[in-house]
A protein has these predicted regions:
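ATP-binding N-terminal substructure of ATP-dependent carboxylate-amine bond-forming enzymes
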Residues: 1-96
Length: 96
């Protein structure tokens, strides 16, 4: 059972995932870059973690962020890493 989820996406996609998590009583951590520091959707999350702008394409950064915040799983959202099989393998191998 997932209790805490890292959202590895931005903007409206992150909000849609967050809303679904709320319905399922799953805590949400949103990963973001410094460029998004002041985005309003971040205030909706239970927690946030800042990653570098390049991290949206580097799966290891999201895995490290999820582990540092006690997440059980990562939702890649749409685009970025969602279509990357190596990222899926990495997440699985790390027990997320």
């Amino acid at each position: 059972m997932i209790k805490r989820l890292l959202i590895a996406n931005r903007g409206e996609i992150a909000v849609r995932i967050l809303r679904a998590c709320r319905e399922l009583n799953i805590e949400v951590v949103i990963a973001h870059s410094r460029a998004d520091d002041r985005q309003r959707y971040l205030a909706l999350a239970d927690d946030t973690v800042c990653v570098s702008a390049r991290s949206y394409l580097e799966g290891t950064s999201f895995v490290a962020a999820a582990q540092s915040r006690g997440c059980d799983a990562i939702h890649p959202g749409y685009g970025f890493l969602s279509e990357n099989a190596e990222f899926a393998d990495l997440v699985t191998s790390e027990g997320l």
